[in-house]
Amino acid sequence: MKIDKIKAIRTLYFAYGMNTNHDEMSKRCPDSIFLGSAKIVNHKLTFQGVADYTEDKGSILLGALWLISSNDERSLDRLEGYPNLYDKSFMEVSFGDRHMNAMLYQMVKRNNFSIPTSYYEHCLRKGYKQSNIKI
């Protein structure tokens, strides 16, 4: 790994939707480094056309843990429509036997459940497979 790439990394990012897909992340966030699958307890995956999550006692939100640079974060902010469509925060994630805080995005406006497109679902399933997330 190049030393300049290590210096550019500054944020742990938890992806649970399209950004679990390694092909998409390599285009969107070229400095990103995939660490592995991770989870957030007492939350679950929901859909409002695209992936979102909600608090749900006893559930587990599965996702991919990445290291991203500040440039990657700015790119994600634009892509996720931050702060109008998605907001971002830090939550505790479980990564193996370790617990750490990671950034993630959540939709600002809470709408009713709506099914994602078949293309979105395909990319999401591929991302879960690439990220070794068991569904």
PLM features: residue spans?
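Glycine-aromatic micro-motifs
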Residues: K2-I135
